[in-house]
Amino acid sequence: MKYRWIAVVLILALGLSACGQKTDAPAASAQHIPAALKTTLTPDSLPQYDFTGQAMTYLAYIAEHFPNRCASDDASGHDAFGQWLLSELAGCGYDQVQTQDFEEKSMYDETVHGRNYILTFPGRSAGKQIIVGAHYDGDGAGDNASGVALALATAAGLANAKPYYTIKFVFFDGEEDGLLGSKYYAGHMSADEIANTIYMINLDALVFGDYCNIYGGVYGDDYDAGYIALSEGEAVPEPTLTEGYDFAADTAEALGFRVHRTAELDGYFEKNGRGMTPEDAFFTNPWTNAHPAPENMFAASPATIGASDQAGFAVKGIPYIYFEATNWWAAGAEPSLAYTGYIETEDASLGDGGMFMNTEYDTLETLNELFPGRAEQHYHLFSPLLSALLLVKAE
């Protein structure tokens, strides 16, 4: 979610999708939208795994040894991280990791040579799959060593599991340059792959923000993933394709977690003049057309804007589930970013006006100093939910 504001400015000015090019999307049809995600969800029926300890270990290791993983930067630890990732997965018993190289223009019109890493975990069903994505490029602990750490910990922890669906863990490159790796991957999926993908789960920036959020949904019948050019006073289209979010929220509740959904959040800020008190619970974007953000209304609940790797899949009609930690109720120090979900903490004196991603403050040292125990607290929410979503039969 790193380049969100630059993208928003471009989109509002030009009316284009990310990277300045609108992705062709299929028309709504049964072959592109999976069957309703319905199953009996009870604590006894759900697999319950928590890989927080391993995620914390990976987060600390990546932050220390690979603080700079920027794409196409020979001076960074980008390539070294890729070699370590392959070695780590091989140590978990995964020796058939595929690489997907690409050459794409960034949103700055620079050529980026990137590489995605794809781990395929075969399932028992015929052709059905779930995709888990986390981008590894960048230079932040929160953004996005935290997402990579959880994906790695989950892949390692489930190495001996027998999932119903095939699971693909994809470590994307080039997110910071315009979602390049994820759009390339999604753009090269076959029609059968698209039709047989239950949902895509995006893990991005999980540890700094005040609230643990789940998102899902796109805007309009053309599957706009979240970039919309709005006239003054025009409402954001109501989200569709929210099956992924709904199923994730249902699963979280079945696991015993508190989930604050759109209906509960709608109008809370207007009534109380503040956001809810942070707690060990799941939240989502609180803004709706009935009770919009005080400023900068760009996204309607439970969706977000398409500034992370779920976007390329959403425009293909694939339901997504997006995990992120941030604070939609925070105004921050920069008016143009107020209430957009880009401000991660309420206290604007921390970080850069309440922001950490894409700043010098996105380090593990800062995280532990300002928010001791927060990373572990968040992983204790995200990890069990992720594992359950990968192992439960969703149809």
Predicted regions and their residues:
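C-terminal motif of bacterial Sec signal peptides marking the signal peptidase cleavage site
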Residues: 14-18
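Bacterial signal peptide processing site
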Residues: 20-22
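Second-shell loop/turn segments in exported
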Residues: 41-50, 63-79, 104-108, 135-144, ...
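Extracytoplasmic/secreted proteins, especially bacterial periplasmic and envelope-associated proteins
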Residues: 50, 54-57, 61, 76-91, ...
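A non-catalytic alpha/beta surface segment that caps or lines the substrate-entry region
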Residues: 57, 61-122
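Alpha-helical metal-binding/catalytic segments enriched in His/Glu/Asp
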Residues: 119, 128-179, 386
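Metal-dependent peptidase/peptidase-like ectodomains
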Residues: 174-320
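His/Asp/Glu-rich mid-to-C-terminal helical/loop segments that flank catalytic regions of hydrolases
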Residues: 330-395
